[in-house]
């Protein structure tokens, strides 16, 4: 096993450490999304765990309860897009 193998192994260890640091950093961050001009807001962490949900009473319509579900889905999608954007930006600095 020549020095090429040792170099590749060292690079792999470095990438693994960078990836673990990126994961740890993301876990500490919060990403928010909202829908309906702020009627529903959702916050997730870097692992995509739901951290907070806020629903303003104005969107609670007993005649159309599906509105809240639609707004929740849209707010979650926006928060997930923010997380995905952050992950993409972080991965740009990774050597793979």
Swiss-Prot record:
Keyword Aminoacyl-tRNA synthetase applies: no
SUPFAM superfamilies the UniProt entry points to: YbaB-like
Keywords: Cytoplasm, DNA-binding
Gene Ontology CC annotations of this record: bacterial nucleoid; cytosol
Pfam family, one: YbaB_DNA_bd
GO molecular function, one term: DNA binding
Classification via InterPro entries: YbaB-like_sf, YbaB/EbfC
Primary localization class, coarse: cytoplasm
Record localization: Cytoplasm, Nucleoid
Entry-linked PANTHER family: NUCLEOID-ASSOCIATED PROTEIN YBAB (PTHR33449:SF1)
Family statement drawn from the similarity comment of this UniProt entry: Belongs to the YbaB/EbfC family.
Assembly description: Homodimer.
Reported function: Binds to DNA and alters its conformation. May be involved in regulation of gene expression, nucleoid organization and DNA protection.
Protein name: Nucleoid-associated protein CT_335
Organism: Chlamydia trachomatis serovar D (strain ATCC VR-885 / DSM 19411 / UW-3/Cx)
């Amino acid at each position: 096993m020549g020095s090429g193998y040792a170099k590749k192994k060292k690079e792999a260890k470095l990438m693994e450490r960078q990836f673990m640091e990126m994961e740890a950093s993301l876990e500490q961050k919060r990403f928010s999304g909202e829908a309906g001009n702020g009627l529903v807001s959702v916050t997730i962490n870097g692992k995509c765990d739901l951290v907070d949900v806020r629903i303003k009473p104005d969107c609670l319509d007993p005649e159309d309860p599906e509105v809240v579900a639609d707004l929740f889905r849209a707010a979650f999608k926006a928060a997930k897009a923010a997380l995905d954007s952050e992950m993409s930006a972080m991965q740009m600095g990774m050597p793979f």
